[in-house]
Amino acid sequence: MADSTDSIRKAAVDAIKSGEDVARRMREVTLEALRNRRFDREGIRDVVRAVTEGMAAAAPASGGTVRQVMGQAFRGMDEALTKSVEAGEQALRQLVATGRGMADHEVKDALAGLKKIEQDFIETVSAVASSANERARPELRALVERATQFGTETGKQSAKLMAEFTFTGMELAGQFSARFAQIASGVLAGMADALEKSAAAKRKIP
């Protein structure tokens, strides 16, 4: 499968080893993996785990370089997950706008799930850090600590969404319905395509 764990991990390794525009490359790797999976928390965690494992495996030997590269790679993942939240927001707005057959709990569960993406992101990176090699472990832990203390762009996007949708019952399971997942996956694929075309156009400019 094109989106298998091994292929995602290898793509992340290649992005790190390229040493160029690591944040953009990692964002593209993460987005490509996300768009090829069902839009749900389990799929997102699987992608984050595989990408982070690739980051750790490819960590260069130099301490200073490790910090810089890992920071860029983490930022790329964060940017991709921010797009996931944005895709979820658009899917939610589409569902609310149509309203036909729309159950209140479907909206609440989708919101609860989107709210937890940052938590899943940080916890997954932290879990990978625990078993990472000696070069990558301290840098991953530092990234987790910083993200926990100051937050991520993914979390900021989620918070913005929560402020706009004032529903109660946010402590639901946070599982995405099939209908929501299908719409969000389509939106995310469109975002990924647009970003890819924009990046390709910029690379052509002398």
Predicted features, each with a name:
Residues 4-205:
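Extended, low-complexity, charged alpha-helical tracts
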